[in-house]
Amino acid sequence: MKIPQRYLQNRTSNIMQEYATINKSILDKLNPSNLYRFFCLSLYRNDYYKVRWRIKDLARHTGESKDALKNFNKDMEAVLVRKRYSEPINHPVYKFTMRSLYCIPPIEQPNFITISHLFMKVNLSVKVKGYYIKLLLIADNNKIILSSKKLADKLGMGKKNIESYNLDLYNAGLLRFLSNGFELTPKDLLLSNDIAKQRKEWNPTNSKNVVKLVFKSK
């Protein structure tokens, strides 16, 4: 049986939210590139913080090749749960393929930040964007009073990379240097945590979440 393409397309998450939240606890669990990829993934969560995406969907939104994401699912095991499910496909031999359902972790009050979807439009590399998210996670009042060496030690990164990324952020208008560190200038990219909504929990006793079955006696 041929399955309508419209039905197959609806099996992926294609509605982008206005923002994504990032818990401070994941700071040391993901490298900069994966942290930005996690942000992009989170933007397409539903009310239950679930995302149905293929690797090629993620690659399309981050502007990367699929090869660059070959270890993505394994790396994400440090911060989220990935469930596998079968999906029907139009294929002469195989009736279905396996897809991923990503379960985004709930908000950890009060230790999180809220980032606007507009961050995706910033013209910087995936690594630099992920590095900026790390800076937002550790900043105090948007300020980081650390030398490049101390910051590199804190984030587990190379000092030269830190200095290079800082220059990219400065040129993009997202950072300004101070005499003893620097200040982040995210403007409308960093939102108030007050707007963030916690994920909904699946409640099988809620009639809206249950498919009602009626059995008729013969």
Regions found by a protein language model. Give the residues of each.
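Electropositive, intrinsically flexible nucleic-acid-contacting patches
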Residues: M1-K218
